[in-house]
Curated annotation (Swiss-Prot):
Pathway: Porphyrin-containing compound metabolism; heme A biosynthesis; heme A from heme O: step 1/1. GO terms for cellular component: plasma membrane. It comes from Pelagibacter ubique (strain HTCC1062). The chain crosses the membrane at residues 12-32, 97-117, 130-150, 161-181, 194-214, 256-276, 285-305, 310-330. PANTHER family: CYTOCHROME C OXIDASE ASSEMBLY PROTEIN COX15, CYTOCHROME C OXIDASE ASSEMBLY PROTEIN COX15 HOMOLOG. Belongs to the COX15/CtaA family. Type 2 subfamily. Its EC number is 1.17.99.9. This is Heme A synthase. It is a multi-pass membrane protein.
Length: 336
């Protein structure tokens, strides 16, 4: 019934595209969980329990009592009502429930493919890497949450950046597999790989800085553009602070670096456009990337000026997926 190569490719494409979409949704929910300060509302991992939300007042009181023990409640949300707690609880609950579903949706089809298509021509075990990374992401998610349960009012921005970066890496890996299955035609004349990798490193750096900024609530200060409240450099720090050990813990410096990296990235993307013109490639690929970058910059500015309005901030985070996907299309076209 199932065992032929054409069926395998058809099911594989459907699975990868659906999985990609689910993880995009999970990133969106995770971002909203962060933006609504909901991530610490469930104080235990509950890997195999907690599938159902609290069903009665006693269960709600249990979760609320546990939340009252952590610094975030004592120092920030003291006096919060149970109804207010339910709002932040459901954001974190939705994120965890979706994560469980993604884990199952990754493993079950993989087992199905192994059972029915292992002897077909195009079968590969490489897709199990996705499941491994999804499991790793679950551990890192709890590692992140645990950093805000004992001494800190919030999660570590370093661990937050790891959590977001791994989610985006998983998406890029899945997207690469999708391109590979569709056998997208490659460029005949290659762009220098070192230059493309340099731009990729800048994009990754910008995403990490964005995660730092979010974790430090650094978007709530210097809400002006292109200046930083009337100056080029934040006025509450000095240039000497750029070489101190507290460099990545200072929200003012992180915002300055996030802005500066965006300008630097834009400069090298202009160079990339000139290379495209010179080599006379199909311009639609770089145009797609250009639009993604410009849209992301626009969203970043609007998010900043608005004082991190949730809708703009959420779209700005999702914009990083569009930027990475459009750039990985260029990387794939340029690969051997």
């Amino acid at each position: 019934m199932f065992v032929n190569s054409d069926n395998y490719i058809k099911y594989l494409k459907l699975w990868l595209i659906t999985l990609f979409s689910l993880i995009v949704l999970m990133v969106a929910v995770g971002g909203l969980t962060r933006l609504t300060d909901s991530g610490l509302s469930i104080t235990a991992w509950e890997l195999f329990t907690g599938i159902l939300p609290p069903m009665n007042i006693n269960e709600w009181n249990f979760y609320f009592t546990e939340y009252k023990k952590i610094p975030e409640y004592k120092n920030i949300n003291y006096g919060m009502s149970l109804d207010e707690f339910k709002v932040i609880f459901y954001w974190e609950y939705a994120h965890r429930l979706l994560a469980r579903f993604v884990g199952l949706f990754t493993l079950v089809p993989l087992l199905f493919f192994t059972l029915y298509f292992k002897k077909t021509l195009h079968y590969s075990n490489k897709y199990y890497w996705i499941f491994f990374l999804v499991c790793l992401q679950g551990f890192i998610g709890w590692y992140m949450v645990s950093s805000g349960l004992i001494e800190n009012n919030d999660v570590s921005h370093f661990r937050l950046s790891i959590h977001l970066s791994l989610a985006l890496f998983i998406l890029c890996l899945i997207f690469w597999y999708i391109l590979d299955i569709h056998k997208i035609k490659k460029f005949e004349n290659k762009i220098p790989n070192l230059f493309l990798l340099f731009i990729l490193k800048l994009i990754v750096l910008q995403i990490v800085l964005g995660a730092f900024l979010s974790g430090l609530d650094g978007g709530l200060i210097y809400n002006s553009w292109p200046d930083m409240n009337g100056s080029f450099f934040p006025n509450d720090v000095s240039y000497g602070d750029l070489i101190t050990t507290q460099l990545f813990n200072n929200p003012s410096i992180i915002q300055f670096l996030h802005r500066s990296t965006a300008y630097l990235l834009l400069f090298f993307i202009i160079i990339l456009n000139f290379i495209y013109f010179k080599k006379q490639y199909d311009f639609k690929y770089v145009l797609f990337f250009d639009v993604a970058i410009l849209f992301q910059i626009f969203l970043g500015i609007i998010t900043l000026i608005s004082g991190v309005e949730i809708t703009y901030a959420s779209l700005h985070q999702l914009g990083s997926i569009l930027v990475l996907s459009s750039y990985f299309l260029i990387l794939y076209k340029n690969s051997n």
